[in-house]
Amino acid sequence: MFVTLIKPLARLHPRAWDFVQLVRLDRPIGIYLLLWPTLWSLWIAAGGVPELKNLLIFVLGVTLMRAAGCVINDFADRDFDGHVARTKARPLATGKISVREAWITFTILVALSFGLVLLTNAPTIWLSFGAVAVASLYPFMKRYTYYPQVVLGAAYSWGILMAFTAERGELPASAWLLFLANVLWTVAYDSYYAMTDREDDLKIGIKSTAILFGDADRLIIGSLQGLTLLLLALAGNRFELGACFYLGLVVAAACFAWEAWSTRDRDPQACFRAFLHNHWAGLAIFLGTVADYALR
């Protein structure tokens, strides 16, 4: 449905769709995976429905920063993407968009995001610098470490910290449980994603947890997902959440079980579907959180 809504953008200018693809608006899964944990945290930090201003800031901010992350990722990978079946048609890899145009796009997106952050408070503004730094660092880690997914996890979890400071003006220690849970979850689902490209990555020297885990990949992913649920349950206890929140965790656990079963043969397409499926786990936890506060 999201792609259907943005399709008319292709008619605005002959090159409009190239930029849509550059910022991955045609593939909104990254927005969802970044948005749900941020929304969990906004609701928990607010003790219910957050301020409308903060809700709008974070929804727009997530969308803009995910887009900026895609641009810097494609810049970093522009010499590799042409050798990977899944990424060879990306606009920077094909030359449809120049490096200069990509940098201009990245700068505009970050500037717009920072403009939104300026509407919050000082602690959130200071945290935003870390968000940009970690998001910019991630794409280059694939050259040097088998743990780029951990850096991605930190980038995808930074909104959790900012949500608390925006709502409360401070960062409670218990927020780090949510942060760590989301880092582990991100490593898990992005390992499924990396499994789809594992053979190509081995040929061109790109590192990932999928390569590091080897034949133990599914076992380790399942363990990471289990730890994610445990940490979320601990966070739920610390923030005095109730049955609806834990029901959301049960639904997420069912999603994780389906992913483990569906990838039993390690088929690349099945691994990609498992990656996409994590959106439903995040949504279930969000709905459980919302329901828990709404029914009090």
UniProtKB/Swiss-Prot annotation:
GO terms for molecular function: 4-hydroxybenzoate polyprenyltransferase activity. One of its GO terms (biological process) is ubiquinone biosynthetic process. Pathway: Cofactor biosynthesis; ubiquinone biosynthesis. It is found in: Cell inner membrane. Keywords: Cell inner membrane, Cell membrane, Magnesium, Membrane, Transferase, Transmembrane, Transmembrane helix, Ubiquinone biosynthesis. NCBIfam families: ubiA_proteo (TIGR01474). This is 4-hydroxybenzoate octaprenyltransferase. It comes from Pseudomonas paraeruginosa (strain DSM 24068 / PA7) (Pseudomonas aeruginosa (strain PA7)).
